[in-house]
C-alpha cells in the first residue's frame, strides 16, 4: 500500500474594512465606533486557470504540485464570522461570497453580501477586535456557537454517511488513463480562522482571515482491474478502523482560544472534546451510485478517487502524524470486497492520499 501526504493548497482570506468617505492625502480617516464592518475576500491560490470546464469549488480533482486549488462557487459560498467586541447584541453575521466571474481566476470575490440584512457587525468601543470565522455556516454541520469570555465555543456534527454531489471524469492525454473523481460535499470540509486587529491601526487596510483545515481528509484512489478485459461496478464503499474503539465521525465540541496577552505571537489554539459515543460513527459510508441509480463501472487503466472526512485528532489538536489501520468494504454488483488492515499514516487536519491495490473482478 502507498500513501502520500498532500497539504491543502489554499488559504481562504477575507479582507475587512471600515466604512469611509473620500478623503484627501493630508487627512486621516480613523474608524469610528458604530460603523459597519465591510467585507471583501480572496482565496490565496496563486495563479490558477479554470480547466476542463470546472466552475465550482466543490471539487478537489485538479491536483497540482504544491496542493489543491480552491475556487469560489459561482452560486455562492456561505461563511459565518463572529466578533465578541462588536457593538450591541449582534456578534455574528453570515455572508454569501461569490467570485468575480469576469476574470479567469475565481479566487477573487465579486461580491460579499450579508445573508440576513438585519445582521450587521459594527465596530465596538474597544480598540482591539477579535474575529472568528467558520466555513461553512451550514446549520446542520456548524450547529451552534457561544462566546465565553475571550473564547468561542462551537459544536460540529460530522456525518457518517458522506455521499458525493456528483462525479467528474478526466482522461490523461499522454497515458490515456481515465480518472473518475468524486465531487464531494464541501460542507464536510470544515475550516476556521482567527485574527485580531486594532481599529486605530486599520484605516483602510485589509485584514487577513486565513482559514485552516479543521477536519482530516482521506484522498483515496482505487485503481481498476489489472486485466484489460475486466471491469467492476462499485456501488458503495465503507471505511472503518480495525480498532473499534476509534471513532471517525460524530458530534463534538471545539473551542478557539486566542493567545494570551503575554504571548509573543497572535496564533489561536484549538481545544476539542471527545465525540459523543455512537456505534454508527465508527465507520464512513460513501455511495458510488449516480443520478441514474447506476454504480460506477471501473475498467482496466481507470481509477476512482473519493474523499472521506474524519474528526481531527482529539487528544492533541496539532499537525502530528498518527498511524491508523483502516478496513475498506467495497460493494460491487457481484460481491463485497474487503481490504483489511491498511496501515495509514495520517497527518491531522490535512489531505492525506491513500492508494489501494487494483480492485479484483
Show which residues each predicted segment covers.
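Sec-type signal peptide cleavage vicinity
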Residues: 3-8, 16-361
